[in-house]
Amino acid sequence: MSNERVLLIDSSTSVLRVGLAVSAGKIFAAENRDRFRHAEFIIGLIDRLLRENGVAKRELNGIIVSTGPGSFTGLRVGLATAKGLAQALKIPVAGVSTFEAASPRLYRTVGSAAVLIRSRREQFYSGLIDSPQFDSRMIELIDISEITSRFPGIPLLPVDMPDFPSIPGLRLIRPEEFTLEHEDFLALGRERLIGTGHDSLASLEPLYIQQFPAGRINE
């Protein structure tokens, strides 16, 4: 598969983001910051991105979509849109989790770090990034009271949480140090699309996480 003209859909956070990789190193992006109103804007945002950059839907070669974890409704909107386009255009689609997307550049930039994504008010999806690759099966659901003991001395990256509180003894990674970008999803997703890592439409689902007695998660 060509890695040109690949569409990205990330609806896992409060910000709806779409991206378009037209060639190596040439990426266009668009966002909508009307918090969690993704269903209203996703089709229009994709259409505008393609139109402004002279790409017709029929020219797309693949789709990359965020599988989260994150907003339940937002993820369903993004996955449904990606699947519908992939089926209509007969092109492959690859799901990439937020943890997987962040890992390569975050590890190069900061070293070992913990990523946190809000689940409920005081619960978080968490994962330790200690290499450029991350296995999404290692995500855990933890309470805010557990963060210090789980990640002692390890920098924390709260995703889409500008109000995340300071925790004594732990360092928060500042936005100027690292912010998750469209390119992070596109880089990994394009690798999968070119290889054999694309997903079947039937099995591609958001990354749902349930807590079990040991704290480990099941997808």
Each model region followed by its residue ranges:
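Short, conserved micro-motifs enriched in small and acidic residues
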Residues: 36-40, 72-76, 180
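Short amphipathic alpha-helical face segments that pack within enzyme cores
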Residues: 41-44, 80, 84, 101, ...
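Phosphate/pyrophosphate-binding loops at sites that engage ATP/ADP/AMP, CoA/4′-phosphopantetheine
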Residues: 46-62, 149-154
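DPxDG-like acidic metal-binding loop motif
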Residues: 62-98
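Recognition helices and adjacent regulatory flanks at domain boundaries
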Residues: 21, 33, 51, 55-58, ...
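Oxyanion-binding and handling regions
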Residues: 1-27, 33, 37, 94-219
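Short, well-ordered amphipathic alpha-helical segments that serve as non-catalytic structural scaffolds
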Residues: 38-53, 99
